[in-house]
Curated annotation (Swiss-Prot):
The modification N-acetylalanine is found at residue 2. The gene is atps. InterPro entries: ATP-Sase_PUA-like_dom, PUA-like_sf, Rossmann-like_a/b/a_fold, Sulfurylase_cat_dom, Sulphate_adenylyltransferase. One of its GO terms (biological process) is cysteine biosynthetic process. This is Sulfate adenylyltransferase. Its cofactor is Mg(2+). Keywords: Acetylation, Amino-acid biosynthesis, ATP-binding, Cysteine biosynthesis, Magnesium, Methionine biosynthesis, Nucleotide-binding, Nucleotidyltransferase, Transferase.
Length: 420
């Protein structure tokens, strides 16, 4: 029998604020929504951000800053990054509590309406301190907000038209309704998701394999395990590899049958009568990155719970981006430890994974904590980018050739365009 995680916030079904049509908006005040917030509003509308029915009210916003949670029916539910809608001071002045406003895309199309709860000023220093845990602002996460000229926030409830996804990998993106239906259809007794914003090298890939095998050992005698490579394909910082290229690498990895090759425990899977390659699916999640470390790890878990996933993998430096001087904002495993400190309810279970590397003595990837004293094969991130950028194939013990080839083609095209 399928086991699907309950919707966050105590709801029986994911929030659904998608409508077929909108009333006339010609006379309504307008809120221009940038591409990033457009995506967030659609994730609210499709239930990925349940129990929200719109951008956060001031009461919810303040609750997240103070308690790392939102209250529903007298109960606190885990939530670590406030999600109100940024607006300009001029837009805020035109909004009235209890009345609708039109949501307008950057291209000028009205895509939804917001019934206003209230507009309020945006205390960015307080926001940054609560989310990132530091008053320093020399890091990518802080710049997301400090570079935004908007000074106010608004909360309320939304109704939006369905988004017409046009990217080439649109069939590989799953939303709460479709993912939950898939989990039930496949009869997964447990499921595990791995979050990434990067192309995978084998140590990354092993985190997914490890999480799947840990779950398999726990429930594999009685339950079929669903395994999901669940990358974010929303807005990222400029030096991250674009979503289309990353998705191509993931497709090569999974459709090519390379997942876990040489690193998985073949005997374990065989003994449970299950198959990692057949049970692993690629499911993109169209949501932005906040580069928020531990705070974002909790949000990532909430997204997956709303998708219906039962277990979520948390590795080292989850959602991490250091200070500009390369010093660390958070400890390597702070994103794992935050789940032990949450006061709000969160039903999805986490699977913690430590450092992994290819070990010469083993002939495959394993956990560093279990293989102390053995010889690792590794390439630094900067060296890896340098090799791929120059068209040099990295060591296959570090990155699979199918993944590397996609990236080398990407950098070659990028370099050619830059010199044209």
């Amino acid at each position: 029998m399928a086991n699907v995680s309950p919707v966050h916030g105590g709801l029986s079904e994911p929030v659904n604020r998608v409508v077929d049509s909108l009333p006339s908006t010609e006379l309504l005040p307008k809120i221009v929504v940038n591409a990033t917030d457009y995506t967030t509003l659609h994730r609210i509308a499709d239930g990925t951000l349940s129990p929200l029915t719109g951008p956060m009210t001031k009461a919810d916003y303040d609750s997240v800053l103070l308690k790392k949670g939102i209250e529903r029916d007298g109960k606190l539910w885990a939530w670590t990054i406030p999600l109100s809608l940024p607006v300009t001071a001029e837009e805020a002045k035109a909004l009235k509590a209890g009345e609708p406003a039109a949501l307008v895309s950057e291209s000028g199309d009205v895509f939804g309406t917001l019934t206003v709860d209230a507009a309020f000023s945006w205390d960015k220093p307080a926001f940054l301190k609560a989310v990132y845990g530091t008053e320093r602002t020399d890091h990518p996460g802080a710049r997301l907000w400090l570079d935004d000229p908007r000074t106010d926030l608004v909360g309320g409830s939304i109704s939006v038209l369905a988004h017409d996804e046009a990217r080439p990998f649109k069939d590989r993106i799953l939303y709460p309704q479709s993912m939950r239906a898939l989990l039930k259809e496949q009869g997964y007794g447990a499921s595990v998701a791995f979050q990434t914003r990067n192309p995978l090298h084998r140590a990354h890939e092993y985190a997914l394999v490890y999480g799947a095998e840990k779950l398999l050992k726990e429930v594999g005698d009685s339950s079929k395990v669903g395994v999901f490579l669940n990358p974010l394909v929303g807005q990222l910082k400029g030096d991250d590899v674009p979503a289309a290229t990353r998705m191509e690498t993931y497709i090569k990895l999974i459709d090519g049958g390379f997942i876990g090759e040489g690193d998985m425990d073949e005997e374990l899977w065989k003994s449970k009568g299950q198959n990692l390659r057949e049970q692993t699916r690629l499911a993109g999640l169209d949501m932005r990155m906040f580069y928020g470390g531990p705070s974002e790890a909790v949000m990532h878990a909430i997204y997956r719970q709303n998708l219906g996933i039962t277990h979520f993998i948390i590795g080292r430096k989850h959602a991490d981006a250091p200070f500009d001087d390369k010093s660390a904002i958070w400890g390597d495993f702070d994103a794992q430890e935050i789940f032990e400190k949450l006061e709000g309810d969160l039903q999805i279970k986490t699977v913690n994974v430590g450092f992994a590397a290819y070990f010469e003595e083993l002939g495959h990837v394993g956990l560093c904590s279990e293989n102390k004293g053995k010889t690792t094969v590794s390439i630094s991130g900067s060296k890896m980018r340098e090799m791929l950028n120059s068209g040099s194939m990295p060591d296959s013990r570090v990155m699979r050739p199918a993944t590397a080839q996609v990236l080398m083609d990407y950098y070659a095209a990028k370099n050619k365009s830059a010199t044209a």
